């Protein structure tokens, strides 16, 4: 029922704007997890074959591992939220099963597991914090003859706005740059290929690491009100040779960052002849009554709504 409702609303929003989407509550949580790099789950990776959704690996120290009841190749038959009626996940895609397993910190999820010998059992687990560090910025040093080149991969312009100590891509990029400077690299490559964008605030902060100070991007509302977002902090973290790698899937914040580096003549932008071409800004608008103290989870999810356009 929820899936049909979500599909119905998105069929309407897509007629008006390709970047406006309705998120059902579980999809809203998934979007927040992607942006923050943090979720609450059981510490297991899933896979799928003809037998259904299976356990591919168990993270040492995680809830599944600590239970001692879940092992690789166990098939997940049903998933229940606490004492609620279990959902039969036979025929589910792995991504849909994952959304049911994840939830709020400290809450209970019950998995009906089928063992390789055909026996079934219900395993009760308490969700714990999991960090998606593979989605964070990371760096490497490339040896080019007698010279060292620094390489930084940024998959998304992620930001955890719900937790003060949460992950921020601009802070992580600064840490990686400091590591590369300590290695005495001759230049740095920042790879935003396949980076679909993310936080507008973070891209301004990140561009400020490579310029002294100044405007980064202008945003404009439907009423025509313009606002310039600038790096207000004097000083440059890294002033050496810089290359930004893009491709046709580099969108939104990636395009803002590459454009700022180009406009300030701080580095070269290399890759495809054009990037994705997304020039709009979205915000999440919650639907329904809050389901938690912070209002992060709401009764009917949220709409990611286009509010503004951005300009170089």
What residue ranges belong to the model's regions?
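Long, charge-dense accessory insertions within large macromolecular proteins
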Residues: 2-35
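Conserved functional hotspot residues or short segments at active or partner-binding sites
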Residues: 1, 311-312
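Catalytic palm active-site di-aspartate
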Residues: 76
């Amino acid at each position: 029922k929820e899936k049909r409702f979500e599909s119905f609303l998105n069929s309407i929003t897509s007629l008006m704007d390709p970047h406006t989407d309705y998120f059902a509550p579980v999809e809203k949580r998934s979007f927040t997890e992607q942006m923050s790099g943090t979720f609450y789950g059981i510490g297991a990776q899933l896979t799928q074959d003809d037998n259904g959704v299976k356990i591919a690996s168990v993270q040492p120290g995680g809830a599944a591992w600590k239970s001692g009841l879940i092992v690789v190749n166990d098939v997940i038959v049903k998933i229940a939220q606490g004492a609620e009626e279990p959902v039969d996940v036979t025929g589910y895609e792995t991504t849909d099963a994952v959304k049911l397993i994840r939830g709020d910190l400290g809450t209970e999820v019950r998995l009906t597991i089928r063992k390789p010998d055909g026996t079934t059992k219900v395993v009760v687990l308490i969700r714990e914090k999991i960090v998606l560090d593979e989605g964070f910025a990371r760096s490497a040093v490339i040896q080019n003859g007698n010279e060292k080149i620094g390489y930084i991969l940024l998959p998304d312009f992620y930001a955890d706005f719900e937790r003060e100590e949460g992950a921020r891509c601009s802070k992580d990029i600064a840490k990686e740059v400091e590591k590369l400077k300590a290695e005495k690299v001759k230049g740095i490559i920042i790879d935003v290929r396949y980076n679909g964008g993310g936080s507008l605030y973070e891209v301004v902060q990140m561009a400020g690491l490579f310029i002294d100070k100044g405007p980064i991007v202008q945003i404009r509302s439907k009423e025509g009100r313009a606002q310039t977002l600038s790096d207000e902090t004097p000083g440059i973290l890294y002033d050496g040779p810089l290359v930004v790698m893009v491709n046709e899937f580099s969108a939104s914040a990636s395009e803002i960052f590459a454009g700022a580096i180009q406009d300030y003549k701080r580095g070269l932008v290399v890759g495809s002849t054009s990037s994705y071409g997304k020039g709009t800004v979205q915000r999440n608008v919650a639907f329904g009554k809050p389901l938690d103290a912070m209002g992060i989870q709401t009764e009917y999810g949220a709409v990611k709504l286009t509010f503004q356009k951005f300009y170089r």
